Amino acid sequence: MKEDYIIFAVGECDYAIEVNKVERILPITEITPIPYMNKCIKGVINYQNHLLPIIDLRYIFNVTAYDEVMKKLFTQVQNDHSVWVESFKNSMSENRAFNLTTDHHACRLGKWLDSFSTHNENIAAILRELRPAHKQLHQMGQEILDIRDQDIHQAQEMTDDLVHTIYQSTSTQINKLIECSHTVSDQLQKLLICVENDIWFALQIDGAKDIIHVDKTEIKPMKQESGTNEFVQLQGVIETQENLVLIIESINVKELSSKNLPTVNMA
């Protein structure tokens, strides 16, 4: 007999859980931390006037926290543009070729900016400053390179303005993103509102991907030691056209309850 499963991402791996255990998928709203709880519990949210515990699957599966991933990305793009500016200055002072991109869509930051949108006003305010400054940085770089062929001295003067004004503005906004890495990560992740044994909870995931129909006979069992976790029991693995998907058999809600968490029975 076939069952419907929803596939979702946690880090580089895909997992699936039975659709009949999932109530809905929500963006992450304000999370209230709970002191002295197991670290796999991110906190609670108010869902239909009930408090639901949020289970951090990245922590459970020993995957780097998403806010740390975003902080690393923003630190990398800050370094990228520092290197870009230094290389540009050297190419001007030594009158040699500049080999890095002047296309603001092509760099690491540009690709991320093109793919990201937000309803968070604080992050949106940063992006309203960052997007035009970043675009101007690369475009002005190309303009200076074009001018250098006719007037090297004017190009060098423009380089000073590029560095002291436009780059500083870009760098300032990137630093703000680094400081807001946690907020950005919450904008990118989702919550699966789930129910098991009449107890409701939320799974924090990187994103939902697909619904698949699975015959139970297609699930390949896992070794007991690799499929066991204090909170999550893995049933096995299935192979899709894209990759392997780990099937979650159950969430250990009894263990959750034993930790004095605010689990909710809404039956």
Where are these regions (language model features)?
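Short, structured motif recognition centered on aromatic/hydrophobic residues
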Residues: 15-17, 51-57, 202-203, 243-248
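Compact, glycine-rich, soluble single-domain proteins
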Residues: 41-44, 58, 193
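Flexible, small-/acidic-enriched active-site or ligand-binding loops
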Residues: 24-41, 206-240
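The feature marks the first
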Residues: 1-39, 61
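Positively charged
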Residues: 9-10, 20, 193-206
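N-terminal membrane-sensor/transducer module of prokaryotic signaling receptors
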Residues: 64-188
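Extended intrinsically disordered, low-complexity coil regions enriched in Ser, Thr, Gly, Ala
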Residues: 60-68, 102, 150, 186-187, ...
